[in-house]
């Protein structure tokens, strides 16, 4: 083909362990992918850090590979999606980070968030949609300001910049000309008022964070600046946190549309439209904003362990040699033989939020084989997804009729069929599974007029396979009731027998 006549969008997907760059054409086909891993640093127990320079280098290597077969002049837009919450502070003049990036998994700031939880829980939840937790950026910023020499003084003089990874990459790509983020990433800092769409002064004062270090918050699709890094000026016109980008990439543009991403853990997001519904057991977050001072919201449920349970079955039990062996093994038995597996290795996330829960396999008899356990592991992913979706439907007052899926385990036909069966709704798997990158490519393309409407994007998006429920209501109820009983037995276990949380 004559690629010179083609227009391309470059999506930078900066994850927790690797930086990726994916090149899309104007029909949203993947043209090329570059991926480079970078290390995580663990200076002390509970500390998880990245070197921002290593992220930048890996990202640029990934870009180089992704665009190796085309002329960079054909790239009409760049979009950036990122691991959310991870925090970088850097010197405004030199651009040099003042400390390593503190990663979303880092728990060092628990004392700060315990204090917030005890004294300001309702205020923070009402304003930000989030619960006080080390996961979010706010306490990480405070820790760097309080613990790294001279940083607070420099911040108060306006000499320090803060950003989540999207902001840091945009700053680097534009040679320091743009210090911006989008609504979706801002909503994960625990400093952004999701009702007023502005940085919240009350929370900033509480944590003694100067507002001058924060980026300007813009819609998820507009030109933020121009990158010179590829040899010619290319507009950076899309920005969204990874899970929100995946929701957009699944063309979940309407209220009640929902997606599940199955990775090491799973993230389920439901589009709830223009009003930030308050939730007891889930997070309320900004999905995206396509216009200034207007946002679409989502309910989010995070499940800590899904794909990681397959890794444990492979590496911990050595029951299989490679992860792909679990599906044929699980398919070799007709059902789970009464076995349930609750993967509470690090407690349970949404909707239980029990840090004291521990993993459990129950229902074992003399006839149980490793195939039954394999099946129970796969089924646990589907049960946990139903747990979250039931709460979403109840709290949003929305009944859903289909679930869009992506991520590694979504390739597993047995699991996807069981997911449809246990939910009693259709499960839809898209042709392009790189929904995070595709979502931000869509946002970037919209930002420069490559596509002109959401309808146009919906028409480009293609289905790979639909899984239709075939299980009887009676069987569905019985299986799910067994799961709920198993979860009850797993909850609070570390409190009963002791052991570290």
UniProtKB/Swiss-Prot annotation:
Binding-site residues, glycerol: 84-85, 135, 242-243
Residues that hold sn-glycerol 3-phosphate according to the record: 16, 84-85, 135, 242
Reactions catalysed: glycerol + ATP = sn-glycerol 3-phosphate + ADP + H(+)
Pathway annotation: Polyol metabolism; glycerol degradation via glycerol kinase pathway; sn-glycerol 3-phosphate from glycerol: step 1/1
Binding site for ADP: 16, 20, 264, 307, 408
Keywords attached to this entry: ATP-binding, Glycerol metabolism, Kinase, Nucleotide-binding, Transferase
Binding positions (ATP): 16-18, 264, 307, 311, 408
EC number: 2.7.1.30
InterPro entries associated with the record: ATPase_NBD, Carb_kinase_FGGY, Carb_kinase_FGGY_CS, FGGY_C, FGGY_N, Glycerol_kin
Gene Ontology terms: cellular component: cytosol
GO BP, one annotated term: glycerol metabolic process
MF GO annotations: ATP binding; glycerol kinase activity
Function: Key enzyme in the regulation of glycerol uptake and metabolism. Catalyzes the phosphorylation of glycerol to yield sn-glycerol 3-phosphate.
Entry's family note: Belongs to the FGGY kinase family.
HAMAP family noted in UniProt: Glycerol_kin
Protein name: Glycerol kinase
Organism: Saccharolobus islandicus (strain M.14.25 / Kamchatka #1) (Sulfolobus islandicus)
């Amino acid at each position: 083909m004559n690629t010179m006549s083609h227009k391309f969008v470059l999506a930078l997907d900066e994850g927790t362990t690797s930086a990726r760059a994916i090149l899309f054409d104007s029909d949203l086909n993947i043209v090329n992918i570059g991926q480079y891993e970078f290390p995580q640093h663990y200076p002390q127990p509970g500390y998880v850090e990245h070197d921002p320079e290593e992220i930048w280098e890996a990202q640029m290597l990934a870009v180089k590979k992704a665009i190796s077969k085309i002329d960079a002049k054909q790239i009409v837009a760049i979009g950036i999606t990122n691991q959310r919450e991870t925090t970088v502070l850097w010197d405004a003049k030199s651009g040099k980070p003042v400390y390593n990036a503190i990663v979303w998994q880092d728990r060092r700031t628990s004392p700060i968030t315990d204090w917030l939880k005890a004294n300001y829980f309702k205020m923070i939840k009402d304003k930000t949609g989030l619960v006080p937790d080390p996961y979010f950026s706010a306490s990480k910023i405070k820790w760097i300001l309080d613990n790294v020499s001279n940083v607070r003084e420099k911040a108060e003089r306006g000499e320090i910049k803060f950003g989540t990874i999207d902001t840091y990459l945009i700053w680097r790509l534009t040679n320091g000309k743009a210090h911006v983020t989008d609504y979706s990433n801002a909503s994960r800092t625990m400093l952004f008022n999701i009702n007023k769409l502005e940085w919240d002064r009350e929370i900033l004062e509480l944590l003694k964070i100067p507002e001058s270090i924060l980026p300007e918050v813009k819609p998820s699709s507009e030109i933020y600046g121009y990158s010179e890094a590829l040899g010619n000026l290319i507009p950076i016109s899309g920005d969204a946190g990874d899970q929100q980008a995946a929701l957009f990439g699944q063309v979940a543009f309407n209220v009640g549309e929902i997606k599940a991403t199955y990775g090491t853990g799973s993230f389920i997001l439901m589009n709830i439209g223009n009003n930030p519904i308050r939730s007891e057991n889930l997070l309320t977050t900004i999905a995206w904003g396509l216009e200034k001072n207007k946002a679409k919201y989502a309910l989010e449920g995070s499940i800590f362990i899904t794909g990681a349970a397959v890794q444990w079955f492979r590496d911990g039990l050595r029951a299989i040699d490679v992860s792909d062996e679990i599906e044929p093994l699980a398919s070799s038995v007709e059902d789970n033989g009464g076995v349930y597996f609750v993967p509470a290795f690090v407690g349970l996330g949404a909707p239980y939020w029990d840090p004291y829960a521990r993993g459990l396999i129950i229902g074992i008899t003399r006839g149980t084989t490793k195939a039954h356990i394999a099946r129970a592991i796969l089924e646990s992913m589907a049960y946990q997804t139903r747990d979250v979706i039931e709460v979403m439907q109840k709290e949003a007052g929305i009944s859903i009729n289909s679930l869009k899926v992506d991520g590694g385990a979504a390739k597993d036909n047995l699991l996807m069929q069981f997911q449809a069966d246990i939910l009693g709704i259709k499960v839809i798997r898209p042709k392009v599974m790189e929904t995070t990158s595709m979502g931000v490519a869509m946002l970037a393309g919209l930002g420069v007029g490559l596509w002109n409407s959401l309808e146009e994007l919906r028409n480009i998006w293609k289905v790979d396979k639909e899984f239709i429920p075939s299980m009887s209501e009676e069987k569905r109820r019985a299986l799910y009731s067994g799961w709920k009983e198993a979860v009850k037995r797993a909850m609070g276990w570390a409190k009963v027998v002791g052991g570290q949380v």
